[in-house]
C-alpha cells in the first residue's frame, strides 16, 4: 500500500502535520474552498519564488498564512512592501485579517516540491530530461539525502507512444512510517504534450511528530505582526543509517 498512496498523506499525524489547521463547524465547506483559492492564488502569484509549502491557520477573525520558500527576498520585498501588498490582495479573497509568516527553505535540494518544479522548468526549457534528472539526483545526494527516486512519464523525446522512466539512488523506504519521505508531482508542458514528473526524497528517519521540518527557518522580516516563533525543530530526533 505504501507504494501506491501519497507518502505525505500516509504520514499525517505520525511525523507530518496538516497544511490546514482550523475547526470549521458549519462553515467547513466555505473555509475549505477559501483555503483552496488562497493556495491557488499564492502559487500563481509567487511562481518565481520557489514556494515549497503553504500552511493556513484560522481563528475567529484572523487567517495566518505560513509560506515556505527558497527565495524569501522576492516575497518580502524592500522593507516588507511586497508582504503588505500581498496582504491587501488576499483580503479580496477573505474578509478576515491576514497575517503572513515567511519561512526560508535552508536546503532546497532536499525539498521534493522545489526539485520537481526545477526539473519541470528545465524540461520546458528544452534541456534533455535525463540530464536534468541526473543533475537533480546528484545535488540532492550531495546535500545529505539518504535516497531519491524520480519518475517521468509521457512522450519522452517526442516518441509516438508514451512511456515511463525511473531514476533512483539510495533508499526510499515508503513502508517505513518514521522515514521522512518528501513527495511532489509536477507537470512539464512541452511541444509534444504534457510530461508528468514525480519525486520522492528520503531525508532520514524521524522520531516524534513535528509541524514544520527542520529544513525551514523563519526570516526576521516575516515576523511583522506575528509572534515570530518557530517550533518546527522541537521534540524530534533524526537517525542516520551507518552503512
From Swiss-Prot:
SUPFAM superfamilies in the record: Prokaryotic type KH domain (KH-domain type II), Ribosomal protein S3 C-terminal domain
InterPro entries reported for this sequence: KH_dom (IPR004087), KH_dom-like_a/b (IPR015946), KH_dom_type_2 (IPR004044), KH_sf_prok-type (IPR009019), Ribosomal_S3_C_sf (IPR036419), Ribosomal_uS3_bac-typ (IPR005704), Ribosomal_uS3_C (IPR001351), Ribosomal_uS3_CS (IPR018280)
Keywords of this entry: Ribonucleoprotein, Ribosomal protein, RNA-binding, rRNA-binding
PROSITE patterns associated with the record: KH_TYPE_2 (PS50823), RIBOSOMAL_S3 (PS00548)
Disordered: region residues: 217-243
Pfam families named in the record: KH_2, Ribosomal_S3_C
Family annotation (Gene3D superfamilies): 3.30.300.20, Ribosomal protein S3, C-terminal domain
An individual GO BP term: translation
GO MF assignments: mRNA binding; rRNA binding; structural constituent of ribosome
CDD domains: KH-II_30S_S3 (cd02412)
Protein family per UniProt: Belongs to the universal ribosomal protein uS3 family.
Subunit architecture: Part of the 30S ribosomal subunit. Forms a tight complex with proteins S10 and S14.
HAMAP family assigned to the protein according to its UniProt record, in alphabetical order: Ribosomal_uS3_B (MF_01309_B)
PANTHER family: 30S/40S RIBOSOMAL PROTEIN S3, SMALL RIBOSOMAL SUBUNIT PROTEIN US3C
Name of the protein in question: Small ribosomal subunit protein uS3
Protein's organism: Phocaeicola vulgatus (strain ATCC 8482 / DSM 1447 / JCM 5826 / CCUG 4940 / NBRC 14291 / NCTC 11154)
Gene name for this UniProt entry: rpsC
